[in-house]
């Protein structure tokens, strides 16, 4: 048995879009068949049925109503599927045989432009990767905003590129099937598309650059052209950027510092507390800038100048915020314009946004000569009054969403529209009068003239009045409680009314397309305006945060220094309240004070102190004021952190292995301009190993890297490194003791401590009283018996006495080239040395 003609048509189309779930239009539904139906039924939680298709068995089928398909499509996209929409492209009434169908739209996670499928405040990236001549290139696009960027790195710096991919968090990626560095794809949560080979079609390359960059660009553009043919109109020249031209921090640092989100909710993050943006464009800009702070002194100073003007001018700031509040997302609207998906309501959004641009331009006129950025914003705000006037005279103030539904063109814009509208309205008046006339003629007071899309106009008479129906009524449909009729006269006027309505809807759509084409000429102006608005909104958000939280303008310098007076952690301070937060000073350079070794109990504030230093640097380098009484920030090229210990057992990695991998990454990538934060290094292994590794890392940083470093530890023995290793300074967190009660003062001061207050912290954590009291008894017994480090055999070799000539295991340990070893080699070697050490006992 062969398939039915309709199913053959389906299978032919499905063959061309085998990587998509095919939504096949049948009447008022999109139907899915075979494996697509099984998947959609499972993912959308809809009923799986079957359909006769000319085979012995019914084929699996499920469907969704076409008018509510968006929600279902969005759900499938969020779960990593692609969807192809196959429409009926001819009127079924006029079709001879099988209705013609074809795919009119493809939706994929990384290429959607409709706001329904997008997060308003988040960019939606798609990337392509290529490798050639020792380089790996990345091409990245944001289709909904028209952004296109390209970067490349040496194959030896693959981890840097991996970090950039994590920063972008793409929802889709494209690579050739023979792409070797699959390590780069492991963190992509969306779809990864594998192409057999580079498309044969010629894609024009209008830029010079490495072959890897050109190949990545070709892969991306060829894929996008299949999804969205207007893609070349969306993008201009790609932006070439170097990852190392921004302050670098990897995914671990982003999570540790809670820059974009914390573990519980997004609001308790750095982004969450400083986001005072009024537009979607500004919100995306702020998020983007927080993940790529600047390294250019002048660019930072220009931002700080603009923020300072906004901080000091209340009237300017609040007027601009009010204007921004009434601006729509011009960036994404301009792309919908290019793609031809813009609707009448979108045009009204553009119209309503333009006067706000005029007000903004007028407001910043008096400050454009005081700031480079205000001058740039002013220059990039075209007024586009022609666009406003065209929309204002042509489109009604509250049009329907669909341009094909009619009711979008204003009266007086087009004479023919006015004529059709008059004919339709006169016809509708005739219907009202006809209903009145028929009630009088028949004596049926409940008689109604109604309309639906299936039967057109009809007369409805209840069962109780059927004996009064005249002979010229022709029965059309029998209902439970009524019957429907038509008359020759009603049919005649139906043709006139529906003819006028159809002609009117068609003409309105034609006029809408003409208006859209005219506005398309201003697409670049719209994009420029959107970019300027995003920058302005970003700067105002920084100014509002500065006022809200009492931030001050930092001094930015090229010197390798970090000096902070009464610095605060902005997120913690917001959580506990300004009055309850204890500010702290910090001074770091690369000479006398290059590594602060911080001791103190858990919960005393060591991690907060370290994190706030990094957050102050990030804020300063995006051009923001900072939470401190005074801050002098020497440009930092990388912030590298090891804070907290999170087991990665799912990947077969223990706490200690994760710790060593992260430390290895820091030591390999840090430079003298970096800021390093190391919290409790070595605690994932035995005391001997932990202290040895911690000291070796400190020595390496001080001798080889010379970076500004904050190093917290519970190994009090390490405090002896002050005076032995240049640049190491001891700092501790003040604690107040009163009997068995301990108060953490959260004040970081020069000095050291030899107490951990672990039992007290256990008490705070709610351990049973019996356990806590027993712990104090055992501690007292140890102390009474003299079981202290200074009275017994040392728990480690003294770090600071005259050292004997190394031999055996120690000599082997010293000779290890830790930086060149992989984490696995280091772990294996450590195990081997431990076995040898046990043998030497």
From Swiss-Prot:
A GO-annotated cellular component: cytosol
Transmembrane segments: none
Keyword Phosphoprotein (UniProt): no
Pfam families: MutS_I, MutS_II, MutS_III, MutS_IV, MutS_V
Segment forming the signal sequence: none
SMART domains named among the record's database cross-references: MUTSac, MUTSd
One term of GO molecular function: damaged DNA binding
Keyword terms: ATP-binding, DNA damage, DNA repair, DNA-binding, Nucleotide-binding
Protein residues bound to ATP: 600-607
Domain of life according to the entry: Bacteria
GO biological process annotation, one example: mismatch repair
Task of the protein: This protein is involved in the repair of mismatches in DNA. It is possible that it carries out the mismatch recognition step. This protein has a weak ATPase activity.
Entry's family note: Belongs to the DNA mismatch repair MutS family.
HAMAP family per UniProt: MutS
Protein name as catalogued: DNA mismatch repair protein MutS
Gene: mutS
């Amino acid at each position: 048995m062969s398939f039915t003609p309709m199913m053959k048509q389906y299978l032919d189309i499905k063959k061309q879009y085998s990587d998509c779930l095919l939504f096949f239009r049948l009447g008022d539904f999109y139907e899915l068949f075979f494996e697509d139906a099984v998947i959609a039924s499972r993912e959308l939680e809809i009923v799986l049925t079957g359909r006769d298709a000319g085979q012995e068995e019914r084929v699996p089928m499920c469907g969704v109503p076409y008018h509510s398909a968006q929600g279902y499509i969005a759900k499938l996209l969020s779960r990593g599927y692609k969807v192809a929409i196959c429409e009926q492209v001819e009127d079924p009434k006029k079709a001879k045989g099988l209705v013609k169908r074809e795919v009119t739209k493809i939706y994929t996670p990384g290429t959607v432009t409709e706001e329904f499928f997008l997060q308003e405040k988040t960019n939606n990236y798609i990337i392509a990767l290529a490798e050639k001549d020792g380089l790996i290139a990345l091409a990245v696009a944001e289709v909904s905003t028209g952004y296109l960027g390209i970067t490349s790195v040496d194959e030896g710096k693959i981890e840097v590129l991996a970090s950039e991919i994590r920063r972008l968090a793409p929802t889709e990626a494209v690579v050739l099937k023979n792409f070797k560095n699959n390590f780069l794809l492991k963190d992509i949560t969306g779809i990864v598309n594998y192409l057999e080979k580079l498309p044969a079609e010629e894609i024009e390359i209008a830029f010079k650059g490495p072959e890897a960059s050109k190949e990545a660009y070709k892969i991306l553009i060829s894929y996008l052209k299949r999804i969205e043919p207007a893609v070349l109109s969306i993008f201009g020249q790609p932006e070439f950027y170097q990852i190392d031209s921004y302050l670098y921090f990897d995914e671990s640092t982003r999570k540790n510092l809670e820059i974009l989100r914390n573990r519980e909710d997004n609001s308790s993050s750095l982004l969450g507390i400083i986001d005072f943006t009024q537009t979607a464009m500004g919100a995306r800009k702020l998020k983007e800038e927080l993940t790529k702070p600047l390294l250019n002194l002048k660019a930072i100073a220009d931002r700080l100048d603009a923020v300072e003007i906004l901080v000091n001018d209340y009237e300017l700031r609040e007027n601009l915020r009010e204007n921004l509040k009434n601006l729509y997302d011009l960036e994404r609207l301009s792309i919908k314009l290019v793609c031809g998906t813009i609707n009448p309501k979108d045009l009204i959004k553009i119209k309503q946004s333009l006067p706000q641009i005029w007000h903004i331009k007028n407001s910043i006129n008096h400050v454009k000569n005081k700031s480079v950025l205000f001058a740039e914003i002013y220059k990039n705000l075209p007024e586009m009054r022609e666009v406003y006037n065209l929309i204002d005279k042509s489109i009604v103030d509250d049009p329907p969403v669909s341009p094909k539904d009619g009711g979008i063109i204003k009266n007086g814009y087009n004479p023919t529209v006015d004529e059709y509208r008059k004919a339709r309205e006169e016809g509708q008046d005739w219907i009202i009068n006809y209903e009145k006339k028929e009630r009088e003629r028949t004596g049926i007071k409940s008689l109604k003239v109604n309309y639906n899309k299936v039967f057109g106009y009809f007369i409805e008479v209840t069962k109780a009045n059927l004996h009064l129906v005249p002979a010229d009524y022709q029965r059309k449909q029998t209902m439970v409680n009524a019957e429907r009729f038509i008359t020759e006269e009603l049919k005649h006027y139906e043709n006139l009314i529906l003819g006028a309505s159809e002609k009117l809807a068609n003409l309105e759509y034609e006029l809408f397309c003409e208006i859209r084409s005219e506005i398309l000429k201003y697409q670049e102006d719209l994009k420029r305006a959107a970019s300027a608005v995003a920058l302005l909104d970003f700067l105002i958000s920084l100014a509002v945060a500065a006022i809200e939280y009492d931030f001050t303008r930092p001094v930015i310098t090229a010197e390798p220094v970090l000096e902070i007076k009464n610095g605060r952690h902005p997120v913690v301070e917001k959580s506990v309240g300004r009055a309850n937060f204890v500010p702290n000073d910090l001074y770091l350079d690369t000479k006398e004070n290059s590594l602060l070794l911080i001791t103190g109990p858990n919960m005393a504030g060591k991690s907060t102190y370290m994190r706030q230093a990094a957050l102050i640097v990030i804020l300063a380098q995006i051009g923001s004021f900072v939470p401190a009484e005074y801050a002098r920030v020497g440009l930092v090229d990388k912030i590298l952190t090891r804070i907290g210990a999170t087991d990665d057992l799912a990947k077969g990695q223990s706490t200690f292995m994760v710790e060593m991998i992260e430390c290895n990454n820091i030591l390999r990538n840090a430079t003298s301009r970096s800021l390093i934060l190391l919290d409790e290094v070595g605690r994932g292994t035995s005391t001997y190993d932990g202290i040895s590794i911690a000291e070796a890392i400190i020595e390496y940083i001080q001798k080889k890297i010379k970076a500004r470093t904050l190093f917290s530890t519970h190994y009090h023995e390490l405090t002896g490194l002050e005076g032995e290793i240049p640049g190491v300074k001891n700092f501790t967190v003040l604690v107040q003791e009163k009997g068995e009660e301990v108060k953490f003062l959260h004040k970081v001061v020069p000095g050291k401590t030899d107490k951990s207050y672990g039992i007290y912290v256990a008490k705070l954590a709610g351990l049973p009283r019996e356990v806590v009291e027993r712990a104090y008894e055992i501690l007292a017994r140890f102390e009474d018996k003299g079981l202290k480090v200074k009275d017994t055999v040392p728990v480690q070799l003294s770090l600071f006495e005259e050292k004997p000539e190394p031999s055996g295991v120690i000599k082997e340990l010293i000779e290890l080239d830790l930086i060149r070893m992989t984490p696995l080699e280091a772990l294996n070697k450590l195990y081997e040395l431990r076995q040898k050490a046990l043998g030497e006992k």
